[in-house]
Amino acid sequence: MRKQQKIHVKIGDNVKIITGFDKNKIGKVSKIDRNTGKIIVKGINFKFKHIKPNAENEVGEIKQFEAPIHHSNVKLN
């Protein structure tokens, strides 16, 4: 079993991204995973998932979602 990491932000905190593609953007923490040390910030770090067509879904689609980022890449604003 993994040891849970101590994270310096809480759900609802406004944070500023300090590294990466979304550097200097500000968002609100919406979810925290203490086992991996990652957080999801609303409106930051969007990724795309391509879904192939299959029997139940006859047309493919592209879904957009917010990917988690490590808590060390943000600071409280």
From Swiss-Prot:
GO CC, alphabetical: chloroplast; ribonucleoprotein complex; ribosome
Disulfide bonding pattern of the chain: none
GO molecular function: rRNA binding; structural constituent of ribosome
Residue intervals passing through the bilayer: none
SMART domains listed in its UniProt record: KOW (SM00739)
Keywords tagged on the record: Chloroplast, Plastid, Ribonucleoprotein, Ribosomal protein, RNA-binding, rRNA-binding
CDD domains per UniProt: KOW_RPL26
Alphabetized PROSITE patterns for the sequence: RIBOSOMAL_L24 (PS01108)
InterPro entries reported in the protein's UniProt record: KOW, Rib_uL2_dom2, Ribosomal_uL24, Ribosomal_uL24_CS, Ribosomal_uL24_KOW, Translation_prot_SH3-like_sf
Keyword Plastid on entry: yes
Subcellular location as annotated: Plastid, Chloroplast
GO BP term, pick one: translation
UniProt record similarity statement: Belongs to the universal ribosomal protein uL24 family.
Stated role: One of two assembly initiator proteins, it binds directly to the 5'-end of the 23S rRNA, where it nucleates assembly of the 50S subunit.
Subunit organization: Part of the 50S ribosomal subunit.
Protein name (database record): Large ribosomal subunit protein uL24c
Species the sequence originates in: Trieres chinensis
